Amino acid sequence: MAKLHDYYKDEVIKQLMSQFDYNSVMQVPRVEKITLNMGVGEAIADKKLLDNAAADLAAISGQKPLITKARKSVAGFKIRQGYPIGCKVTLRGERMWEFFERLISIAVPRIRDFRGLSAKSFDGRGNYSMGVREQIIFPEIDYDKVDRVRGLDITITTTAKSDDEGRALLAAFNFPFRK
């Protein structure tokens, strides 16, 4: 079992129960899933770019990504409905906790000119979204084999009812928020 999951069970639940005066352990917010999304708009011209992006996402997450397709045609972007334009992975359970641990302890500190993540990126329901400009911050990506640097979106979905609860949950994991 991931260390972070044990830490959540042993420490974070107690901390949040006292902070928010919950009556039941089931009211304590928890991390439900982590979604990684990589939009590859350039895949219209070259299908190999999408395969490389999917391989990078598979290396980062340890799970085969789902190829996302365009929902509708947009002439300005020269895309048609059904064109493959990105890939995504939804992590739950053990893989989610392992990825979350690597994200906090290894990947985020490797971001260039890192001064902390914005605490304002919550959606109003306790879910946190962040963007990464370079996939090379993850140790699983070999810098020499990267065809081009691309970013990805990371969404941490929680069971929190409000942004304050979600912020407290992530802060309990020592999430590197900007001061």
Curated annotation (Swiss-Prot):
Part of the 50S ribosomal subunit; part of the 5S rRNA/L5/L18/L25 subcomplex. Contacts the 5S rRNA and the P site tRNA. Forms a bridge to the 30S subunit in the 70S ribosome. PANTHER family: 60S RIBOSOMAL PROTEIN L11-RELATED. The keyword Metal-binding does not apply. This is Large ribosomal subunit protein uL5. It comes from the Bacteria. GO terms for cellular component: ribonucleoprotein complex; ribosome. One of its GO terms (biological process) is translation.
